[in-house]
Amino acid sequence: MKEQLIFDLSRSGRKGYSLSPLDIPERPADELLPSKFLRKEPAELPEMAESEVVRHFIRLSNLNYHVDKNMYPLGSCTMKYNPKINDYTCDLPGFASMHPLQPESTSQGALQLMYELAEMLKEIAGMKAVTLQPAAGAHGELTGILLIKKYHEKLGNKRHKLLVVDSAHGTNPASAALGGYECVSVKCDESGCTDMGDLRAKLDGEVAALMLTNPNTVGIFEKQIPEIEKLVHGNGSLLYMDGANMNALLGITRPGDMGFDVMHYNLHKTFSAPHGGGGPGSGPVGVSERLVEFLPVPVIEKFEKDGQTRYRLNSSKPNTIGRMMNFYGNFSVLVRAYTYIRMLGADGLRRVSENAIINANYLLQRLVEHYALPYPRPVMHEFCLSGDRQKKEHGVRTLDIAKRLLDYGYHAPTVYFPLIVSEALMIEPTETEAKETLNAFADAMIAIAEEAKSNPDLIKSAPTTTPVKRLDEAQASRQLNICCQH
């Protein structure tokens, strides 16, 4: 049943609250506030009983799709199950009731947690230092780019280009532009990896850095990393790794050991914090020795005083790029990531990546006969199929397949990305899904592939069982209207 807007449920004069009688003289609002702050018309607020409000939002919540309900196969998003102990530790009064302007003397526990989290992230990725400030992955990218810029400025290098491989994460070009660089695309070869000939042709004295996602967005590990590292550093450029896909590498290999100078982590993805609906996120940045002096301030330092270990915030860093946000990062996500890492330990983190890789390859093998595979080779934690076969033979697009999947009770995968794959379906099952769940999802995808042959119109009209049917997305994009009308 379609749920009405809360404004449509409103009834004039109905109340969900009661106030005590005034114990002071009542005065008109215009005697207390300047007229410029007063409304000319009463606010259009819904009038409902408390029970009606509760039931309305409960009904809406039952319509939501989330990882606690079922598998969430969004490629490149790592929608893993988030252990509930993360929320427990985050809600501890000593953390939840803190204010970032508290004195350091009363914030030692929080400072210790952030210091130790940075140390663990350093070890996991093989980097020299880590800042926890960036609020999300793309914010971490921008931080890394500004670090690269500061490095070249100090050396007197006037470099204005950033190379971005076309299999990289989608936010890389935008971050490069925001950082003041010209973005130059490097092609992929027929295997889905960086085209070394194209890289050599575009790597010149104007290139500040190469941005690479590894594994890339078709789920393939860049096998030429040693050669890429040698070429980039030999050109006086730096090597940036987008850590969006770190869920494939934990305990197996480390970006720092591969020669990367700077990378960002997505704590909300790899280290399990809820991130559907826009956040909050956390995108810490790790750097090699050559970039440590440029890290954002304040830096958390550990020291000894009166025989006790203490922690402090140090803003006296002359070559810093400055702050990247107010205060010290999204602390609630930092607590969740810290809990996750401490619960799993080094061996557990390696099993996370091993199971993510196993799940992705198992699911791929179940689907590969039914959908085109642009790069036919083993993958890491995710894979990218193509709906080209269904489109050419039956007129069914990837968008139709994604909409039909909603009728089977699943959130759709990432579609039409990466751009190097026609009619792309990017699927990331994560390590937290059981074989039975993978099989059920595969069965749904296979059933849709069969429906494309036998009843393509059914798929083109999907979804048919959801509260909201297919929207006119083209009209919505061209005639944007986000105002509530009632």
From Swiss-Prot:
Enzyme nomenclature, EC number: 1.4.4.2
What InterPro entries does UniProt report for this protein, alphabetically? Aminotrans_V_dom (IPR000192), GcvPB (IPR023012), GDC-P_C (IPR049316), GDC_P (IPR020581), PyrdxlP-dep_Trfase (IPR015424), PyrdxlP-dep_Trfase_major (IPR015421), PyrdxlP-dep_Trfase_small (IPR015422)
**Molecular functions (GO terms):** glycine binding; glycine dehydrogenase (decarboxylating) activity; pyridoxal phosphate binding
Swiss-Prot/TrEMBL keywords:
Oxidoreductase, Pyridoxal phosphate
Could you mention a single GO BP entry for this protein?
Answer: glycine decarboxylation via glycine cleavage system
- One cellular component term from this protein's GO annotations in UniProt: glycine cleavage complex
Pfam families in the cross-refs: Aminotran_5, GcvP2_C
**Keyword S-adenosyl-L-methionine listed:** no
Q: Which cofactor does it need?
A: pyridoxal 5'-phosphate
**CDD domains in the record, alphabetically?**
GDC-P
What are the N6-(pyridoxal phosphate)lysine sites (modified residues) in this protein?
K269
Catalyzed reactions: N(6)-[(R)-lipoyl]-L-lysyl-[glycine-cleavage complex H protein] + glycine + H(+) = N(6)-[(R)-S(8)-aminomethyldihydrolipoyl]-L-lysyl-[glycine-cleavage complex H protein] + CO2
Gene3D superfamilies according to UniProt: 6.20.440.10, Aspartate Aminotransferase, domain 1, Type I PLP-dependent aspartate aminotransferase-like (Major domain)
Enzyme class name: oxidoreductase
**For this UniProt entry, which segments traverse the membrane?**
none
Tell me where on the tree of life, at the top rank, the source sits: Bacteria
Ion transport as UniProt keyword: no
Q: Which HAMAP family match?
A: GcvPB (MF_00713)
- Summary of the function given for this chain in its UniProt record: The glycine cleavage system catalyzes the degradation of glycine. The P protein binds the alpha-amino group of glycine through its pyridoxal phosphate cofactor; CO(2) is released and the remaining methylamine moiety is then transferred to the lipoamide cofactor of the H protein.
Q: Which family does it belong to?
A: Belongs to the GcvP family. C-terminal subunit subfamily.
State whether it acts alone or in a complex, and with which partners, per the record.
Answer: The glycine cleavage system is composed of four proteins: P, T, L and H. In this organism, the P 'protein' is a heterodimer of two subunits.
What is the name attached to this protein's record? Probable glycine dehydrogenase (decarboxylating) subunit 2
Q: Which organism is it from?
A: Chlorobaculum tepidum (strain ATCC 49652 / DSM 12025 / NBRC 103806 / TLS) (Chlorobium tepidum)
